[in-house]
Amino acid sequence: MNVPDDLKYADSHEWIRIDGDTGVVGITDHAQAELTDIVFAEPPKPGAKFSAGDVGAVVESVKAASDIYAPVSGEVIEANDALADTPSLINTDPFGEGWLFKMKLSNPGELDALKDSEAYRSHIAL
C-alpha cells in the first residue's frame, strides 16, 4: 500500500498535496483499493467553496458510490477533467493522474488537524 510521505491525510482517506496556498486533493491508495474498479467520478466545479469535511466530489465503483470530502476549507480552482473519460486513473495512479481537484486554501491552519504519512499508516493498520 503506497502512502507518500509528502502528503497530508484525512481520516476519511483523502490526501492533499500542498503548494503554497493551494492544494491538490485525491483519494488514497487504500481508498481506491477498497472501492475496487472506479467507473465514474464527479469532481466539483471550479468556484465551488467548501468547509473542511464538506462533500467535495463523488466516485462510483462497481461496488459502491462514495462521497469524497474536502480535507480543508477553500475554493476549487481546477477539476481533473480527464476523469470524465478515464475514471480508472483513480485506481491506476491515485497520487498522480488520478487527482480529483485543486483548491485555494482559505484556512491553512486546518492542515494541522490532518495526519502525516506515519499517522495515516497507523490509521489503516499498515
Stretches with model-predicted labels:
Residues 18, 61-62, 71, 106:
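A short, compositionally biased micro-patch
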Residues 46-55, 64, 70, 75:
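Helix-adjacent hinge/juxtasegments
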Residues 1-55, 88, 92-126:
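Acidic, low-complexity mobile loops and tails
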